[in-house]
Structures are given as C-alpha cells and as structure tokens.
C-alpha cells in the first residue's frame, strides 16, 4: 500500500510539473505574440500567399536523379544483375576443400622444415 501511495504521489507531482511548464510556455508564447504584434489574419494571409518555387524543386530533383544515374554508370551498378548473380552463385565446395587441404599440408611441411 505504501508503494501505491508513493507512486500515486509521484504521478500527481509529475502531472503538476508538466502542467506548470505548459502554462509557462503558453504565457511566454502569448507574450511574444503581444510584443511582435502578430495578428492571426496577417499570419493567414502570409500562409495563403506562400508559393513554393516549383521550378527550383523540379530542377533540384532532376539534378539529383542525374547524379544518381551518373553514379550508376560510373560504378557500373545494375541492381537486378547483382541480385541475379547473388542468387545463382554456387561455390565449388570440392575445390575449396581441396585448396584448404593443400594449404594445410603445405603449412605442416613448413612447420617440419623450419622446426616450428
């Protein structure tokens, strides 16, 4: 029961602190609006008259796409070919085992020869 009371007290304290912060922030924001004399109608008008520069946006997108194409050509990237190559890759495990055994034999001979 003690833990429940402590937890409840902490929860209430946390809510009170958060509410105080909200009130302080709201008061500070309203003070700023009063100081700068920002009118809601002015803000609406400014928002309505905002027009993004669509030509610049299109040109930037086209430039980025061209850069991507140049990188693909430069590094010879073809994702579909890479996927196919990865899916069809089948290592020759017999050759790998044979090479590993040869290397192990050579290593054993070197140990004997150099007394390692």
Curated annotation (Swiss-Prot):
Keyword flag Acetylation: no
Keyword list, A-Z: Pyrrolidone carboxylic acid, Secreted, Signal, Toxin
Processing quadruplet motif 2, short sequence motif: residues: 80-83
Modification after translation: Cleavage of the propeptide depends on the processing quadruplet motif (XXXR, with at least one of X being E).
GO molecular function ontology, one term from the record: toxin activity
Coiled coil regions, renumbered to chain: none
Compartments, as annotated in UniProt: Secreted
Pro-peptide region(s): 23-44, 80-83
Signal peptide segment: 1-22
Tissue: Expressed by the venom gland.
Positions of modified residues (Pyrrolidone carboxylic acid): 84
Family: Belongs to the cationic peptide 03 (latarcin) family. 06 subfamily.
Protein name, per record: M-zodatoxin-Lt6a/c
């Amino acid at each position: 029961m003690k833990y429940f009371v402590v937890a409840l007290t902490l929860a209430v304290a946390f809510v009170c602190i958060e509410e105080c912060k909200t009130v302080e922030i709201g008061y500070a924001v309203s003070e700023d609006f009063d100081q700068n004399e920002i009118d809601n109608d002015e803000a609406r008008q400014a928002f309505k008259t905002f027009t993004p520069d669509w030509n610049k946006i299109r040109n930037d997108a086209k430039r980025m796409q061209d850069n991507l194409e140049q990188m693909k050509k430069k590094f010879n990237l073809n994702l579909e070919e890479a996927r196919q190559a990865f899916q069809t890759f089948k290592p020759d495990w017999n050759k790998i085992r044979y090479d590993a055994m040869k290397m192990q034999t050579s290593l054993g001979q070197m140990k004997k020869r150099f007394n390692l």
